[in-house]
């Protein structure tokens, strides 16, 4: 075994790429390290494509092994299970920039598996996973237009920081990941603290400039370790068939794409395609209908793109910078804590907000350590939203990714735990979809949070931008339709406030996207965002003054930290009885903070009263109402506070001489007592007759 190793400095860290020792039966295997964070990336591709396949079956699997962090998995089976949300998101992060680098017409199955085998808690594994994937594909021999570079960019004290550590990220106003080739940015994923557009654009350019060292190093690594390139050639176009398809369908498709209603347009497109295929079959029964479908799709794309480049109206009749008609409603559901219905053209999101206690927060145990997430946002995309049937169940990768994007857009304006001590779960149900449903979720979430009384800093809106570029001519599109997303060259999603950007996601399918184009897209997105915010603010301009009557109200009190054990009780008996008998949820913190949650105000008051009783100190000279709990020859023990008993000596029961305690007192009898003394050992001496004397004097 002769390892081939390439090391280079990248920001604050040393990156090492190694091949030739591990997983030698894969087409390529690279052990990639950044500091002590190490991933094994393997690539396997099938040499032959399945006959008739018209898509590229690329699979990216990213898996974090708990042994990488020196942990044993939880659960009964004590082994890793289905991918976590973090693993799914990183798999998508890797997939998105590499997919457009495979050549058109390449339909061989390719699988990339990234396994995290060692992790430094200060160095997240996503960037080195992207670098390792790029290196493995580069040396595999599989057709791939790499190398690809990747960088994380932070923004701390007005300065960009390359690949910040986890500690540095906690103080950063920006967390941006950018990936690209030597000459082009292909993918951006970020969240930010409402930063100006120029800062966001600068971070993309900075990250792309800095990652050139990665691209150069992988090229050198490939020169030394690369396998022979596959003998693959792109399929040759059947020019005669292309001409026939164009003649039969071009005019019909152009007319169909003047229909503005999505379902009607799709129906007419299907009619045109069916007629073309029928005519081709009549002329040649041996014609390959799969090839015809591919050519019809290409023609469809050409027709739509040509109209846009020529300056003609878009599919639904809009100008490039126009936003579709908006409908904004808040408080649409009676029993939810907050709700909104946001409609933009043929895209609609029904968004709900639910408030819970700290106990309802999401607890995440990953290889990077444990963390608690008080704000959750879940995105659902049922098949009926696009007029289809399909499976309903666990969220798919796309749903997880869109939910996280919307979460990033909103997180910057969420209140702190001190400002709003609730856990918050938002669910966005996409009830109609024709493009930009994740950005509709951002808008709907902002509205639902305000309706629920969550004191977010300001409204947030999102917009999806697109691009059509032919040579030096290009058109930037605002609020793209699903078809424009599919047929265009860029999907550029921007969420933010009036003051700046909170989330940015960009996927570019072509090279040649310049800084100028990105700048135009950001400025056009700003105008669209402000327009949407103006409409949203007409529906609900600020958060409600109070939370819903159906939401739990959290009341916070402070107790002596030394009294926490008294509130909990032996084996949790006291706090369990408190919650069951009052119907409240009670949470205790080590500093003595007690949070009582209930939608019933009287129940909260009762819980507070009982906690104050439990934690209060016995005061000498004070009168208490107590209950006799034990009778002895020399007196009776009386409970005056939860967990606090005192002795009424036989001489303190009455002014008269008492021969037998049982003649005057019985078990569970309620009596009024005065505290006479608390000795150094905490023993309490009580008197019934002194209490009676004091009461008589008061009368």
From Swiss-Prot:
One of its GO terms (cellular component) is cytosol. It catalyses: RNA(n+1) + phosphate = RNA(n) + a ribonucleoside 5'-diphosphate. Its cofactor is Mg(2+). Residues 552-611 form the KH domain. Mg(2+) binds at residues 485, 491. HAMAP family: PNPase. Component of the RNA degradosome, which is a multiprotein complex involved in RNA processing and mRNA degradation. Belongs to the polyribonucleotide nucleotidyltransferase family. This is Polyribonucleotide nucleotidyltransferase. It comes from Shewanella sp. (strain MR-4). The gene is pnp.
